[in-house]
Amino acid sequence: MMPLLLLILLSTRNLLGAAQSQESPVAGERRALDLTTVYVLPRSEPINATVEHKCREALASCYNGSEFQPLHDDGPIRPDPYRFSTMIRFKRSYGELPLPIELNDEFLEQLSLLHNNTDQLRVLLTLMRTSRASDWMSFLGGYTQCDAPKSVVFTCVESVCYEHDLMRLNYTTDLFTENVLGLDVSPPVLSVLVLLRNNHTKAESVVRVPTSSMSMLDGTYNLLRTILGHMSLDTDLIGVLRSYRDRFPAVFSVSDQIKITRQHYRPQYQRKRP
């Protein structure tokens, strides 16, 4: 099955290709985006007929380089600084000895994401759920007092420091409290692509956060079903869903498999005559 991220990128490419297929602008002249003939997916009417007007205005403003006003105060555009997704919830570790940290370019780039970052705590929690989690746990281990809880850390921006108990943060089940760019469906791993940014150092990076969330897999299935339905593709999605039992062993259990398929597929059983 095509990775979901690739599928979304292809859809975006169709949108940009349709917009760029119009007459080429004269050299030195910047044209305004014409949104009247843009099609995203095969359908009988332009996308304008079904897209809310504020979204069209935001797309045109972004393309034409004018000042952009966010439609919402939180979510992927501007995350709520006081809420964190359970996807990056801190998990206490026990009995693990600190290991030497591998100081390579990847670690130094991640370190630049933290330096004087006003959203330092969010970036730190996200990095602690990536493939370099053990390095960051070892790095933070030297900054706790002997009698301090292992879940307490300090963030410092411009020499002003704050204390945080990672076990008592305001966590929410809303995935899009973070800067989510997409989903990476690559069996046997299901990951969320998260954008990390430091406005102070102008550093940014996209990291993969592995997840074993059943609701995430269910949401991915529903999204694929919707996209394939718009494209009129004849795909046995139920069969694909059942194959996930073997392709995502970290996500599925027998009871979970029954739970996720029940709401999409209800087999009709015939009663046997006595």
UniProtKB/Swiss-Prot annotation:
Residues 51-251 form the gL betaherpesvirus-type domain. Coiled coil: none annotated. This is Envelope glycoprotein L. The heterodimer glycoprotein H-glycoprotein L is required for the fusion of viral and plasma membranes leading to virus entry into the host cell. Acts as a functional inhibitor of gH and maintains gH in an inhibited form. Upon binding to host integrins, gL dissociates from gH leading to activation of the viral fusion glycoproteins gB and gH. Residues 1-21 form the signal peptide. Its main location: virion. Interacts with glycoprotein H (gH); this interaction is necessary for the correct processing and cell surface expression of gH. It is a peripheral membrane protein. InterPro entries: Cytomegalo_gL (IPR002689). It comes from Murid herpesvirus 1 (strain K181).
